[in-house]
Amino acid sequence: MQGLYIKSYGCQMNVYDSLIIENIIKPLGFSIVNEPSEADIVILNTCHIREKAAEKLYSELGRIRKIQETKNLTIVVAGCVAQAEGTEIFTRAPFVDIVVGPQSIHTLPELIVKARKIKKQIINIDFPVISKFDAIAVEEYTKNQKVSAFISVQEGCNKFCSFCVVPYTRGEEYSRTVEAIFKEALILADSGIKEITLIGQNVNAYHGTYKGNEWDLGRLIQHIAKISSIERIYYTTSHPRDMHESLYEAHGIEKKLIPFIHLPVQSGSNKILRKMNRKHTAEEYINIIKTLRKHRSDIAYSSDFIVGFPGETDEDFENTIQLIEEVKFSQAYSFKYSPRPGTPSAEYTSQIPDEIKSQRLTKLQELVHKQQLEFNKKMIGETHPVLFYKKGKFDNQIIGKTPYMQSCYINTENPDLYYNKIVPIKITDAHKNHLTGIIPNTLPV
């Protein structure tokens, strides 16, 4: 057996793609290894969302090149940086063998065999007519998932936010058929999966077909919920413009759909939202939150925020703070704006000094962390179902997550008894990033 090392950067879509890559390359005679030095093929599945993504790639490639100098090593750059940089990767890192975009990963077995045979660099960053989902048997991307699994239902984006590279690296919106998704869910359920996360760049823009009729995400969720052994359903990431009535209804009707939604707003300033080309206002976002609460009162919210977008004034930033205070988020991800080459906002004037960005980010994060801790503390004394999926750092410690996507730690003499199961846990303490709990005495062992 030869060694295969895969490093995945960024979002859940990349994690999912890396699983596909692993499962389609293993049959060529490879097994997964934990270090690049143990590998015969190294695959870097890259993300292009954050600042200096390309530079981080080249830095990692420099380290891997030293390994290549000591052995016959095939180096593959995949993902969104591969799509964005293209042949520039060969120019800056001529020792790379293969560059492949995220929509062409299904061609990797062929590319690897060819590159090793002809000893020449190969690139495939096309957006093929036949999608990777049509080209790969569904069984290949359901392997090796344990208690919780991703299903990609939608890829690409048609929104063209002025700061974002996704439409250029992942292509236009594409939705898989209901039949293909349901088949994948059934296979996962049969393998013991308890929780399914439906993923997409704009997952609530899903518009797949079933027997010639178009379905939206709300209807798809209720269909998947019919699988009895699937106990939890979650979806991410959503765009406010794509929230729709059947999705609201699913949150109210379908108890398997967890009471948590990640719904990025980015800014609370309508002026900045227009410059971002978000196609919604702060008021519309707040109305979405209110509508969700009408359907399920205990729902928790997460968001993304960008501070220091070009032209953001103190007043604009305070509008964001006011929105956060009104919504009260249980979690949030916040970043300083960084220009992405090729996006419209990279050319905007009125770029904000980094010092001001840092000050605003600190203030925003302090507020969000305060809200997060307050939300977690409300759980103390309550009992919640926790899905345990991994062992902790210490002996007898096991880690799970509540329906509100909070990490929960417990100590037990028999951690293996609860691993890969959903167990009622009484919450005894709360911290900013996690809860701790105990198994109630009434729970049969």
UniProtKB/Swiss-Prot annotation:
- Please indicate if the UniProt record lists Metal-binding as a keyword: yes
Gene name in the database record: miaB
- Subunit record text: Monomer.
Q: Could you tell me the keywords of this UniProt record?
A: 4Fe-4S, Cytoplasm, Iron, Iron-sulfur, Metal-binding, S-adenosyl-L-methionine, Transferase, tRNA processing
Which Gene Ontology terms cover its molecular function? 4 iron, 4 sulfur cluster binding; metal ion binding; N6-isopentenyladenosine methylthiotransferase activity
Which Gene3D superfamilies does this one have?
A: Methylthiotransferase, N-terminal domain, tm_1862 like domain
User: What are the GO cellular component annotations?
Assistant: cytosol
State the protein's name.
tRNA-2-methylthio-N(6)-dimethylallyladenosine synthase
What are the binding positions for [4Fe-4S] cluster 1 in this chain?
C11, C47, C80
* Residues annotated to bind [4Fe-4S] cluster 2: C157, C161, C164
